[in-house]
Amino acid sequence: YFVGRNTVWVHNTECKVSDNRRRHILEGEGPDDPGHGPNRGFGNSAFPDTWSDDNAIKAVEDVANSPKSIWQQATGPGSGRNAPKTIGGPDPNAPLTTRNGRPVRFTVEGQNHSLDIRVIVEPGGEGIVTGFPINR
C-alpha cells in the first residue's frame, strides 16, 4: 500500500489470498481455464498431488511475502522484460497504477519446498491475484 501524497511503496503488510482468488487458483475459471490445485490434472503448472489445497495456498502466500522472492513489474508504464527486478518487494520507483488507472501488477518468483512458484500480486489493489508452480 502507499502512504501520503507522494507515491511511496510500503511493503510491510502480508499479501494474502482472498476466498475468491483461492477458488481461482485451485479450481480455475472453467474447462478452458482449469485450476492449479493438487489433483486437478492441470499438468506441470498444478501443485503436487501430495499437497493439500491449504498447502498450495500457503506456498503462494509464502512466496509473495518472502524477503528472498524476486519481484518484477508486469503491467503499467515501465513494465515488461526490461523492468527492474527487486528482491523482497516491489520496485520503489514503480508506478502505483497503469495508464487506465488500474493497480500495477508484479510477477513474484520464489521457492517453497524446493518448488519454483510464480505469483501475480497487485500491492495497491487486490493483493495476490494468482499463483502456480513453474519449471516442473
Predicted segments with their positions:
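HINT/intein-family self-processing domains that catalyze protein splicing or autoproteolytic maturation
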Residues: 1-14
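Functional cores of ribonucleases/endoribonucleases
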Residues: 22-23, 27-136
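Helix-centric, low-specificity signal for extended rod-like, repetitive segments
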Residues: 14-15, 33
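Long, low-complexity, intrinsically disordered regions
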Residues: 15-17, 64
